[in-house]
Amino acid sequence: MRKNACMLENPISANQMYAPIARGKMVKSKKYNLWIEKNLPLVKEQMEVIESFPINLEIMILANHLWCMKHDSDNLVKPLIDLLVKAEIIPDDTSRYIENISVRYLYMPGPPTVRISYDFVE
């Protein structure tokens, strides 16, 4: 059976990816690096390396209404795609490999969870 999806808890926002250092320079934040480090083995375990491109990527955010009102869906996309690249599920985040990204919310009580899945473009 093809492993084309994974579930991750507590998605991080792109707003939390960078931390300022001297003179306006930005570096990846400690929180972002810890999130990547925690979720990298989960993605590698749950998903197979994709070998045929391009793909359609679907991101489903399972969270309560309060969390959804405080977080922008577009800010959740970049860290998730970065995670797929770091896990070597996809080689790069360009349109050569990802043709379409859809994001949707589904109400669920409890901690926010995200489901990442893909289908091949026909």
Where are these regions (language model features)?
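Acidic, proline/glycine-enriched N-terminal capping motif
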Residues: 1-122
